[in-house]
């Protein structure tokens, strides 16, 4: 019981009502229940799932562009963070649709089920987002999906318009960030995670490919292709 109220006090920093906290807890319980059938979260994290998953996702709510009509969760999985954020946005009476991209049939079915039960303003795309083009969104969020350089490439190539990209970074986050800035130009701010000393959040804007390295890469590809043709 003490842990329950401790978690509520953490979320209270984001002006979360008791009713909404209860809804978040119900969502957490549904994840654990469904986890017996499909792999939604690590079994090691179920005992601390409120802090490890729900609060961890909720902490980015203040980074969401509330002036936009949509937010996009790429690689949504169990709805972390998409469903959590949708619940919080409704609590704050913010009119925004949450688009969730998850190519797994079983996980997408779970997302549809909880969205319907909690009456959330979501749209579930059971598709491979890497195959989508000219996407438009306000904020884009992603957690435990792909390495940062891959995510930057996806957003730069597949989204024609967006406000910001919010990325959850883990233990090797600093190393991935160092690798990313070698090939990409982008504005970013770091935010310390509330749930782990080893983690942090990135709020990214204006992603651009570093064209010098990109041209060298393209030149290398052309040389390889030319070499193949000469061998034929």
Q: How would you label these PLM feature ranges?
A:
Residues 1-66, 72, 105-120:
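Class I SAM-dependent transferase core
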Residues 94-96, 160-163:
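A short helix->loop->beta-strand "cap" motif at the edges of active sites that frequently abuts
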Residues 147-155:
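A short, conserved alpha-helix within the catalytic core of class I
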Residues 162-172:
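Conserved beta-strand signature within the Rossmann-like core of class I S-adenosyl-L-methionine
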Residues 85, 155-156:
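Class I S-adenosylmethionine-dependent transferase superfamily signal
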Residues 58-142:
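Conserved SAM/SAH cofactor-binding pocket of Class I
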Residues 31, 85, 169, 204:
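Residue-level signal for inorganic ion chemistry
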Residues 172-232:
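Active-site capping/gating segments
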């Amino acid at each position: 019981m003490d842990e329950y109220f401790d978690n509520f006090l953490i979320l209270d920093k984001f002006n979360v009502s008791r009713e909404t906290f209860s809804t978040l807890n119900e969502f957490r319980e549904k994840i654990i229940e469904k986890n017996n059938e499909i792999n939604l979260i690590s079994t090691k994290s179920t005992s601390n799932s409120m802090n490890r998953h729900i609060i961890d996702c909720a902490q980015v709510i203040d980074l969401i562009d509330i002036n936009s009509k949509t937010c996009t969760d790429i690689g949504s999985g169990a709805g972390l963070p998409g469903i959590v954020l949708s619940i919080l946005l409704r609590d704050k009476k913010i009119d925004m649709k949450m688009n969730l991209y998850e190519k797994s049939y079983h996980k997408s079915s779970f997302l549809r089920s909880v969205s319907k039960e909690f009456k959330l303003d979501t749209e579930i795309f059971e598709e491979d987002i890497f195959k989508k083009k000219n996407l438009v969104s306000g904020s884009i969020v992603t957690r435990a999906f792909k390495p940062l350089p891959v995510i930057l490439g996806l957003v730069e190539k597949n989204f024609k318009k967006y406000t910001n990209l919010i990325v959850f970074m883990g233990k090797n986050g600093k190393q991935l960030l160092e690798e990313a800035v070698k090939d990409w130009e982008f504005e970013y701010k770091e935010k310390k995670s509330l749930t782990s000393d080893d983690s942090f959040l990135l709020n990214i804007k204006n992603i651009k490919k570093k064209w010098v390295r990109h041209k060298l890469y393209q030149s290398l590809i052309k040389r390889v292709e030319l070499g193949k043709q000469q061998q034929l």
